[in-house]
Amino acid sequence: MSVRLVLAKGREKSLLRRHPWVFSGAVARMEGKASLGETIDIVDHQGKWLARGAYSPASQIRARVWTFDPSESIDIAFFSRRLQQAQKWRDWLAQKDGLDSYRLIAGESDGLPGITIDRFGNFLVLQLLSAGAEYQRAALISALQTLYPECSIYDRSDVAVRKKEGMELTQGPVTGELPPALLPIEEHGMKLLVDIQHGHKTGYYLDQRDSRLATRRYVENKRVLNCFSYTGGFAVSALMGGCSQVVSVDTSQEALDIARQNVELNKLDLSKAEFVRDDVFKLLRTYRDRGEKFDVIVMDPPKFVENKSQLMGACRGYKDINMLAIQLLNEGGILLTFSCSGLMTSDLFQKIIADAAIDAGRDVQFIEQFRQAADHPVIATYPEGLYLKGFACRVM
């Protein structure tokens, strides 16, 4: 008999709506013992079967659902089916947009909670973020090896969230070749170097692909400030769009060095690109005090909020940094501003920008809205999957 997680009375509604998480407060009891990440059955208070998921006793998310089909086992064949389903959509996108790199698996939205897989050329970069994902590591890798024999697999599960589920951080080659120090990929006509082994996340922010392309229509003959530039994707796109100058700011000299290489790799005019190692908050104030002005500002900060207790502080941070950006823009200038914090809703983010404009003493018009690229889908039953949001704002 399988181990069962029994829900408290009335707590089955989210599962009936096919939401993939069971929170600790919804659990009445466990029937049997399960190890960390083991597959369990989830039943309502009367014993009616609801789902099959992965058990995580140390997490507030006590179980993550693998399947709502009682006949479906969680094995190599299961992972192969999920991967093939996900690949169909990526194949269409890759052909349509000429991509050699994309997100293959976007966790819950692809039916594989806690699993992220990015493909960069013939390298699959894996992040296992939950106990269930780690428990199924061998089955997942076996499925990947069968479906993608041409690909090497590299593990970037060096993510702090694993500690919340009682797991160590892991990183390194799994199968095949070690990724080169910098792997070239292509995106909308740009050549970009990706640091799989040491870069942020899996090496590159594929989710901003569409936003980087959209930037080009705003920058012709404009002076651009690229904040939190990382390896310069927005900077290269701005130069390809014909900007007169782009200033890229980041705290990491290593990232700025790669950004410079990316400009050179695309045979763009390096004299139009400036790379500044500094704290963005501090530098924006310095620019304001000096009377510096820009025509376009890209504001793409890291996540400011990890949990609900940090949300108010994050709101203040987003408001402050966008206020400073608005103050630095010429009349008619464009602010391209983003938040990758999942707890920050699009409506709240828009309100923060509006409040920032009031504090800056300027009017803004919202002219375009952004979200994560289409290889980062959001399944209807899991709205939390929509984490990246952004706006193009015209500053009056």
UniProtKB/Swiss-Prot annotation:
Localization annotation: Cytoplasm
GO cellular component, as recorded: cytoplasm; cytosol
Example of a GO MF term: RNA binding
Catalytic activities: cytidine(1962) in 23S rRNA + S-adenosyl-L-methionine = 5-methylcytidine(1962) in 23S rRNA + S-adenosyl-L-homocysteine + H(+)
Pfam families noted in UniProt: Methyltrans_SAM, PUA_3
Keyword Cytoplasm: yes
Source domain of life: Bacteria
Main location: cytoplasm
UniProtKB keywords: Cytoplasm, Methyltransferase, RNA-binding, rRNA processing, S-adenosyl-L-methionine, Transferase
Cysteine pairings via disulfide bonds: none
SMART domains documented for this protein: PUA
Documented EC number(s): 2.1.1.191
Function recorded in the entry: Specifically methylates the cytosine at position 1962 (m5C1962) of 23S rRNA. Methylation occurs before assembly of 23S rRNA into 50S subunits.
Family: Belongs to the methyltransferase superfamily. RlmI family.
PANTHER family assigned to the protein according to its UniProt record, in alphabetical order: RIBOSOMAL RNA LARGE SUBUNIT METHYLTRANSFERASE, S-ADENOSYLMETHIONINE-DEPENDENT METHYLTRANSFERASE DOMAIN-CONTAINING PROTEIN
Quaternary context: Homodimer.
Protein name (database record): Ribosomal RNA large subunit methyltransferase I
Organism: Escherichia coli (strain K12)
